[in-house]
Amino acid sequence: MFAKLENLEQKFIEIECSLAQPNIFNDQEQYRKLTKTHSDLKPIVTTFQQFKKLQQQLSENKELISDIDPDIQEMALEEIKKLELELTHLEYELKILLLPKDPLDEKNILLEIRAGTGGEEAALFAADLFRMYCRYAEKMHWKVEIMSQSDSDTGGFKEIIALIQGDNVYSRLKFESGTHRVQRVPTTESQGRIHTSAATVAVLPEAEDVDIEIRPEELRFDVFRSSGPGGQSVNTTDSAVRVTHIPTGIVVTCQDEKSQHKNKAKALKVLSSRLLQIKQEQQEIEQADARRALVGSGDRSERIRTYNFPQGRVTDHRINLTLYSLIKVMEGEIQEFIDALSTHAQTEALKMQATQIAS
């Protein structure tokens, strides 16, 4: 590990020298590549340099143990304990920083939320979840664009799909996929009984043209008039588009735009991301990587989180984390869950790495 860190530090120094050259801006593509690599390496190199600095201090304090002055010996022993603890922490941090990055982490995402069991109450909860993610996106200065939505009769969503664009969106929200369960008293409940409903969340990395190749002969397009809640027609032209990917049977419908061309473009974007998700899941099964182990089978029927309104708590069942701040969570304050899930995934990845080395 330390030989690799030395090499990375040397590479970092060389890049800094290159970036200091006056003619570096002549090649903009090379400049962007170097600044990106420099940015990626900086946390690792900075931590490694701090590690080496503490190692030097540890060595100096160990030499002081042989001093004839007992007070100096005692001070040195106390400092050694402190330094050894800090070095253990930094070594663990370096192992985390050296873990392979998920190549999808920097991508934008398609967020898909669907009402599950619970009828209209599930649709209302789906709307609450969408609002929660929109609030979080606002805090992160991300852009949210609704791609498709199917409204329920009471103001909820049977289904809603949105494109979220910004820095490292997928890396932050990728662990939100799964079944989210709510326990609360519906507004229509006269007896005050608590009902349990659910909605599924799918976080798909946005597919780019280089990620997925879709041949025209694999697609079937159908057009029809768009409709609103209850099935009433909201358009007099055939602007809604249904795209079927024949090899997989995946069907995507978009009818939010008045333009058939725009609906078609949105439908193809959603389809591409779903196909990319299938491709990624197949790779994960083959590699049995740490993220796959974290989210289980990937089956969206798997309950991952419960929102209990009467008790004001939210529990993530994957990591046994409960927060008694439900109102804040529903307002988009979900960073504590995101950080805990990310840390858990890193820990699992380290365990898997250690197992592979041992075998």
From Swiss-Prot:
Alphabetic keyword roster:
Cytoplasm, Methylation, Protein biosynthesis
**Signal sequence: where?**
none
Task: Extract the InterPro entries matched here.
Answer: PCRF, Pep_chain_release_fac_I, Pep_chain_release_fac_I_sf, Prokaryotic/Mito_RF, RF-1
Q: Would you say which domain of life the source belongs to? A: Bacteria
Q: Where in the cell is it found?
A: Cytoplasm
Please list the residues that carry the modification N5-methylglutamine: Q232
Q: How this protein is processed and modified after translation, per its record?
A: Methylated by PrmC. Methylation increases the termination efficiency of RF1.
Alphabetical GO CC annotations of the entry are: cytoplasm
Question: Recorded GO terms, molecular function?
Answer: translation release factor activity, codon specific
> Which PANTHER family does the record associate with it?
LD18447P (PTHR43804:SF7)
The entry sums up its family as follows: Belongs to the prokaryotic/mitochondrial release factor family.
Q: What is this protein called?
A: Peptide chain release factor 1
Which source organism?
A: Lawsonia intracellularis (strain PHE/MN1-00)
